[in-house]
């Protein structure tokens, strides 16, 4: 995936439909195009079990050339978890040249407004990560199950829309970095009873602080250790940016543990930090990949020209011991 070609958007289509017939009208031609593509592996369809059955019936004998996958398993966890699933699948199944037809329908029912907001940004991220790469990706949106604001967001995060008459550019498409950072207000202040420490010199000391505090609040030891490693991904990134001082604050509710890292200087300019998987080399932000895999929410904020410094706030479920 070429991050140096932002002017060439990925083939990342949105397929909006409002009926089973509309679903098949966009999916069947897309999958048959993948089946017919020379030197390309079988296409994949990720959706509900009911819609997978519809596809099998509509494709007939061609169904044997499609990899059918249940969306409940593909899209479980956080957006970062699903991105890891998609990237792992792509690496394992794409042709040597990177070609693959892959269509998926995200799961919207049961998600909170905050989770939905994160999933909207996930779609912008997919366009960013696959920019310059050769796969054909399509995301399905059913107006019967996806809220109207989600449908609207989809048209902002996908460069093209695939419908029964072909592919057309999306007039609402917004550059991924712009979409991912719009409407980000300031984070709420930590509660007054938050526990804080200053980190000077060895910023990685935050790992033990976070793990101990999480366990003291009732989190199971193995979960607390994972959370400590997630926090070390953020402190390690701070150290790589030349920060010799930082501050950690940690607090909890009955169901959540939250840890915040603040630095007195520097800025975060990349809205996709931690979403790109580690590659063959080592990058300063690689530890943030693990941070996002462990934490349900990872919020990043940066100061402006008048106020330097940045914040990474990490939040996860309080998994109780026993």
Model features per residue range: what roles?
Residues 1-188:
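Positively charged, polar, low-complexity stretches
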Residues 16, 190-199:
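Short amphipathic
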Residues 27, 122, 231, 284-287:
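Amphipathic coiled-coil/heptad-repeat helices and related helical stalk/stem segments
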Residues 185, 236-322:
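Conserved beta-strand-loop-beta-strand hairpin that lines the nucleotide-binding pocket
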Residues 199, 203, 227, 284-287:
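The cytosolic transmitter module of two-component sensor histidine kinases
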Residues 204-235, 239:
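Conserved short strand/loop->alpha-helix "switch" segment adjacent to the catalytic nucleotide/phosphoryl-transfer site
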């Amino acid at each position: 995936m070429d991050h140096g070609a932002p002017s060439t958007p990925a083939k990342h289509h949105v397929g909006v439909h409002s009926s089973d017939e509309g679903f098949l009208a966009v999916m069947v031609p897309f999958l048959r195009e993948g089946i017919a593509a020379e030197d390309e592996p079988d296409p994949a369809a990720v959706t509900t079990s009911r819609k997978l059955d519809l596809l099998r019936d509509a494709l007939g004998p061609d169904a044997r050339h499609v990899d059918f996958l249940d969306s409940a398993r593909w899209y479980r966890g956080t957006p970062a978890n699903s991105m890891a699933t998609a990237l792992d699948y792509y690496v394992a199944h794409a042709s040597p040249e990177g070609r693959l037809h892959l269509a998926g329908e995200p799961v919207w029912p049961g998600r909170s407004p905050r989770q939905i907001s994160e999933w909207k940004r996930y779609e912008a991220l997919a366009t960013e990560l696959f920019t310059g790469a050769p796969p054909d990706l399509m995301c399905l949106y059913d107006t019967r199950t996806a809220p109207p604001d989600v449908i609207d967001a989809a048209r902002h995060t996908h460069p093209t829309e695939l419908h029964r008459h072909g592919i057309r550019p999306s007039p609402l498409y917004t550059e991924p970095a712009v979409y991912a950072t719009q409407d980000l207000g300031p984070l709420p202040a930590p509660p007054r009873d938050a526990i804080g420490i200053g980190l000077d010199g060895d910023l990685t000391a935050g790992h033990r602080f976070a793990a101990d505090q999480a366990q003291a609040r009732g989190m199971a030891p193995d979960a607390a250790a994972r959370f400590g490693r997630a926090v070390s991904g953020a402190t390690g990134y701070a150290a790589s940016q030349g920060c010799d001082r930082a501050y950690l604050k940690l607090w909890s509710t009955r169901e959540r543990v939250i840890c915040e890292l603040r630095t007195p200087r520097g800025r975060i300019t990349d809205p996709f930090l931690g979403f790109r998987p580690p590659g063959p080399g080592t990058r300063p932000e690689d530890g943030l990949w693990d941070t996002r895999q462990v934490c349900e929410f990872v919020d990043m904020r940066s100061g402006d020209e008048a106020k330097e410094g940045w914040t990474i706030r990490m939040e996860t479920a309080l998994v109780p011991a026993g």
